[in-house]
Amino acid sequence: MPLSDNLNLLWSSLIVAELVKNGLDTFFISPGNRNAPLISALIHEERSVKKICVDERAAGYRALGHAKAAGRPGVLVCTSGTAPANYYPAVIEAFRDEIPLVILSADRPPELIGSDANQTIVQPDLYGRYCRDSLLIPCPSADYPLEALLARIDSLIARPVGPVHINCAFRDPLVPGIPDSRPIPDELLATAGRLYAREGAYTTYPSPGTLHTGLEDVEAILNRTARGLIVIGRLDGPRDAPALEELAKKLGWPVFCDIASSMKGRIPSDRQIFSLDHPEALRLVSAYAPETILQFGSGLVSKHYFASLLPHSEATVIQISPRAGLRDPAHRVNVRLSMPAFAFVEGLHLQENPSLDATACCLFLDSLETLYQALQRRIPEETLSFSRIASDLLGAVPDGEGLFLGNSLVIRAFDKFRSPFPRKISVISNRGVSGIEGNIATSVGFAEASRRRVTAVIGDISFLHDLNSLLLLAQSATPVVLIIINNGGGRIFERLPIRDFPEILEPYMTTPHGMTFDLLAAQFDLPYFRAATPDELRKAYESALDAERSAVLEVTLDPEEDLRTFQTFQNVRLP
């Protein structure tokens, strides 16, 4: 395959090959110039069956008939303009009858859309509600990760029920043999060659009918793994947590529990990776070099698992999640099992792992423990900081109750620590899109439905976003202890690159307000407490719990002192 001709052909070759690796080997090709890169790739793809179709409308129905007989989709390949529109009747039929169909359309580059360029329409979302899903592939670029391209294709076609649309934009040159204006980087060519030569799909999604086989394959991987790692994100049901406790015992692998997993108090602390956000902890994980990573749940607070650890790891990544869609920001998942965590654990038949490298595991966990104790010693005892608040409250929230964590600095601080002793606390957070509004209302809603008291820890800006929910707080039959960390504004920006631009940082980012919140609590007849030291926080929190009704606890801290503590904390290294 002439991958080196130009980026259009390189991308087209990978797209076509990935479809073939997923079992989609029959292509219904209609002629055109804009889809020439796709046709060129198909000509060189010996594993593909190519059927030439003059009329796209008839091609659509031909592919529909193929899918009805073969039980898997045919792939329709066309140029831009009215060509993909001619598939519409067949697309509607496929949608209503749940027949798998893949449309692979070429498109003009975005700068030509809406410019009166010839043979150009707005092709994204062309089929509207009659398309199960769609993927917009941008013009080929050396800066776009090829792994992301393949992972998105695999995710799109993993559930073959109804039509899906892959729309590929291309700039010139559209034909093979003509190079781009800039040579393709050697590193990109090497990556493309490696991905093209892979025997199977980049990410495999065993279907419900083949989950048993998928589990057997995973069992084999687990049983031959010497150094493994379990990563637990937000879980989906009450049966998941005890199942993962049991799995962690059986495997004997180190475990990272995201704070939102509610698992920090359920996995023994001497088996836990306390943080993936601390540079030295991340270095230790990388040096441990896990061969297999089992990833449960969705989302992680720390971006470094996806941004720093996975891209440089050679581990086989197995993701277990019942949620639909691509959930892989690093585009590194090798096997995706669409099932609840508890069902995965129940379906496994694990034996004692003869391959486990217990020595490497113990050395790794011992180093983590040494680092954790060093970090604890660096947190000032007499002054408040996010680190001190998080460390203390993780041991103070009563067992069996709820802990709501606001976004921004709050949840990141709690994610860096482990529970000091075993406990079952339900951690609640709004991490879907990580907004800072509605935090108080969410806490009240959880407390009312679960009939369990909730301690809600939020920042001052989050509090100001949801002032009207103080009425809900006051009226809640189940108490919510609202802890507001008042550091005078949105101080997370002082830890981001924008800090180097003071003319932007303040007031535009940090939005300082100079307020305290005692009078607001009084307005709603809520008990109010204030703390400015660790000792005051402990006493005030105990008093708020003793009130046995909703209460407000305002914690004031010096943002400059807190920033110094954070910087000292992050700079700790092992000898």
From Swiss-Prot:
Pathway: Quinol/quinone metabolism; 1,4-dihydroxy-2-naphthoate biosynthesis; 1,4-dihydroxy-2-naphthoate from chorismate: step 2/7; Quinol/quinone metabolism; menaquinone biosynthesis. Its cofactor is Mg(2+); Mn(2+); thiamine diphosphate. Keywords: Magnesium, Manganese, Menaquinone biosynthesis, Metal-binding, Thiamine pyrophosphate, Transferase. The keyword Transferase applies. InterPro entries: DHS-like_NAD/FAD-binding_dom, MenaQ_synth_MenD, MenD_middle, THDP-binding, Thiamin_PyroP_enz_TPP-bd_dom, TPP_enzyme_TPP-bd. GO terms for molecular function: 2-succinyl-5-enolpyruvyl-6-hydroxy-3-cyclohexene-1-carboxylic-acid synthase activity; magnesium ion binding; manganese ion binding; thiamine pyrophosphate binding. Binds 1 thiamine pyrophosphate per subunit. GO terms for biological process: menaquinone biosynthetic process. Transmembrane segments: none annotated. Its EC number is 2.2.1.9. It is an enzyme of class 2 (transferase). It holds the Pfam family TPP_enzyme_C. It catalyses: isochorismate + 2-oxoglutarate + H(+) = 5-enolpyruvoyl-6-hydroxy-2-succinyl-cyclohex-3-ene-1-carboxylate + CO2. HAMAP family: MenD. Catalyzes the thiamine diphosphate-dependent decarboxylation of 2-oxoglutarate and the subsequent addition of the resulting succinic semialdehyde-thiamine pyrophosphate anion to isochorismate to yield 2-succinyl-5-enolpyruvyl-6-hydroxy-3-cyclohexene-1-carboxylate (SEPHCHC). NCBIfam families: menD. Belongs to the TPP enzyme family. MenD subfamily. Homodimer. This is 2-succinyl-5-enolpyruvyl-6-hydroxy-3-cyclohexene-1-carboxylate synthase. It comes from Syntrophus aciditrophicus (strain SB).
